[in-house]
Design a protein with these regions (language model features):
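Gly/serine-rich nucleotide phosphate-binding loop at the start of the catalytic core
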Residues: 1-110, 114-117, 121-134, 208
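Glycine-rich, charge-decorated loop segments at or immediately adjacent to ligand/cofactor-binding or catalytic sites
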Residues: 238-253, 261-262, 359-365, 446-463, ...
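SIR2/sirtuin-family catalytic core signature
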Residues: 2-37, 62, 103, 108, ...
Length: 659
């Protein structure tokens, strides 16, 4: 790597370091219940809905206007010429479709956020909040503001209206110009919230007219020196946006790409002046990784305590009390639980519990004794311990509570356990839920009962960490609790590393998608080599699709091919002896052509294949037929030094007139 490449890669790493810093700041604000979300059109794209540009595409075609023009003006021109109903029909028809699963919205709904704002007309956010067991109040016009109901877990402000009432949707230039007159309460409330809360803006492009309006509001509202810090996910200007339908980029579009990149840099600097920090992403899909990072950073300090004893015999802690020890009127088990609650809070962990009999009350006592709460105990129930009692609840309700609590935790400590039977014990249910969530599990064997049995189950499968094994040799309660705290701290360090690594590895995940079609038995080694060369280089603009696991079911294989080719613009065809006769290669070529992909055929000219001029001529003829007469330039893997030139071949395929 030359010095210019090193400088460029260092710059990319610096951007990610800054992104991580912003995400960590957001996490701290979430812990204080200080974050609201503002969702733009990009959020709903993954649900199968179109963005603003594509929503108005039919109108642009009808009016013979450039789709890259001012979209709200275009909507106004249509209304002036044809009336409003056509616009209403577009909104109603587009959002009548059933949405696809949307991972970004799922993570947003999981986050501990109570207020969501959006300029979108669809119901993607409210539906996902309901899936996450969060009741949501929808405010789609300012008249509904007077009906605020505190029983709801979330509020969604739909500033531009709702798909069910397209007549009232904000869409045209006139709608924007009269917004403050017709919907003044929305504007005033948002202005207050921009001062009171930290906002996370998501789904906006750098030239989004809605972002322009919010910036204008921020500039007029946030004129003090100490601005509230806000954050905005923004997709980098990408070269893929400037390819034509043949996947070729002209010199004019290269010039536009350079100008837009500069404009985006200036926009980011301008936003920073008004307290809005930009989290730059390569692709909206990369936001998924960052939202997951936010959620896991929020939950990393959350510990679920699972355990209880027989409510009819609240003095029976089994063999744990065989060692006689009393202090302040507490037996050994009660001392242990109290000390555990105290030290967890002292070390910055938050406790979640179903308040099991003989366990929850002593954990709470420990929280009250924590040094953190020495001045006041007013807010500790909300901030340091989250209790949802299972006592008296029916079984279905119990399981729902357990799942909700455990999903919000990164670790689980299992102590005692009323029943040794898996069928009867809620402890086993909580243990299984924790396994499904991928939680770090600490069964304290010394406490006996279900905790000991779960320890033995995990130990049998070598799933007990060294930190947890060391608890068995603890001599006293202080040592045992210190060991638990240290195990949690080590888990936190390891999780932090994994989360950071995932973010850094995502830098090179997005670019112009490349699909490799080949005969697996003959050419999988070369296909793997190409994938590694292209994906390893963070500086190129390509990403090769990887098949993580070999599939056998023909329906599954074809479905995977369909899904992956949709994400790509280039198909590399590796040609060896029987490649063009293979069923799946033919299918992949067919789908690639239908998707408009550029085809790059590469002949694997090894001694084993022994391609003479006659064979090459036959291959070219077959390929010509499969590509419906379209001419392509054949490359030779060995003769043309493919290892060195593969990225050059990809670059050449984008140049105007190359194909």
């Amino acid at each position: 790597m030359n010095y210019k490449q090193q400088i460029e890669e260092d710059k990319m790493n610096q951007i990610m370091e800054r992104n991580i810093e912003y995400l960590n700041q957001l996490t701290e604000q979430m812990k204080s219940d200080q974050v609201s979300v503002f969702a733009g059109a990009g959020v709903s794209v993954a649900s199968g809905y179109v963005d603003w540009k594509n929503l108005l595409k039919p109108i642009c075609k009808l009016l013979r206007l450039d789709i890259n023009g001012n979209l709200i003006e275009i909507a106004q021109y249509y209304k002036n010429q044809y009336n409003r109903q056509g616009l209403n029909d577009i909104i109603f028809n587009e959002f009548a479709k059933l949405p696809k699963n949307n991972k970004n919205v799922m993570w947003l709904a999981k986050l501990p956020i109570k207020e969501y704002w959006t300029t979108n007309y669809d119901d993607v956010i409210e539906k996902e909040l309901e899936k996450q067991d969060k009741s949501v109040q929808i405010i789609k016009n300012q008249e509904l503001l007077k009906y605020h109901n505190p029983k709801y877990k979330a509020i969604l402000y739909k500033m531009h209206g709702d798909k069910e009432d397209p007549d009232d949707a904000v869409l045209t230039k006139e709608d924007y110009e009269t917004y403050d007159e017709k919907r003044p309460l929305f504007t005033k409330l948002l202005a207050v919230e921009l001062v009171r809360k930290t906002f996370l803006f998501i789904g906006f492009s750098f030239n989004d007219p809605n972002l322009e309006r919010i910036l204008s509001l921020a500039k007029s509202s946030l004129n003090s020196k100490n601005l509230r810090r806000h954050y905005c996910f923004m997709r980098k200007v990408q070269i893929t946006d400037y390819l034509n339908s043949d996947n070729i980029i002209s010199s004019q579009m290269v010039d536009k790409y350079v100008k837009d990149t500069k404009y985006q840099e200036l926009r980011i600097a301008d936003m920073e002046n008004y307290g809005i920090s930009t989290i730059l992403v390569d692709d909206f899909n990369q936001i998924t990784i960052m939202l997951e990072y936010l959620y896991k950073k929020y939950t990393i300090d959350n510990v679920f305590i699972s355990g209880g004893i027989n409510p009819k015999d609240l003095s029976n802690y089994g063999r744990f009390n065989n060692v006689h020890s009393t202090k302040d009127g507490l037996n050994r088990a009660e001392q242990f639980l109290t000390l555990l609650g105290e030290k967890l809070v002292d070390n910055g962990f938050q406790i979640y519990t179903g308040f099991g009999a003989g366990v929850g009350n002593y954990i709470l006592s420990g929280v009250l004794e924590s040094k953190k709460n020495i001045l006041t105990n007013t807010d500790i129930i909300n901030n340091d311990i989250h209790i949802s009692s299972l006592l008296g609840a029916e079984e279905q309700r119990k399981n729902k509570i357990r799942r909700r609590l455990i999903e919000q935790c990164s670790s689980i400590i299992i102590v005692f356990g009323y029943s040794n039977s898996e069928n009867e014990s809620g402890i086993y249910c909580e243990y299984e839920l924790a396994q499904k969530c991928g939680d770090f599990i600490i069964p304290v064997k010394e406490t006996g009962f279900a905790a000991e049995q779960i320890y033995n189950l995990l130990n049998k499968d070598n799933k007990i960490s060294e930190d947890v094994q060391h608890l068995n040799s603890a001599c006293d309660l202080d040592e045992m609790v210190s060991g638990i705290i240290q195990a949690l701290k080590n888990h936190k360090i390891n999780e932090d590393k994994k989360l950071r690594q995932r973010l850094f590895s995502s830098i090179s995940m997005y670019g112009i998608g490349v699909f490799i079609s080949y005969h697996y038995n003959n050419d999988h080694v070369i296909a793997k080599e190409i994938t590694q060369i292209v994906n390893k280089d963070k500086l190129n603009i390509y990403t090769v699709v990887k098949e993580n696991k070999k599939k056998k079911d023909p329906k599954v294989i074809r479905s995977w091919i369909d899904e992956q080719i949709k994400k790509t613009k280039i198909t590399i065809l590796l040609i060896s002896g029987q490649t063009l006769t293979r069923e799946y290669v033919s299918y992949e070529l067919e789908k690639s052509i239908a998707n408009g992909n550029t085809i790059i055929p590469i002949l694997i000219d090894s001694k084993l294949n022994n391609f003479n001029s006659r064979k090459v001529k036959l291959i070219n003829k077959k390929l010509h037929e499969k590509l419906s007469g379209k001419n392509t330039k054949m490359r030779y893997w060995y003769r043309d030094n493919g290892v060195v030139n593969i990225t050059n071949w990809l670059d050449e395929s984008l140049e105007e007139g190359e194909i």
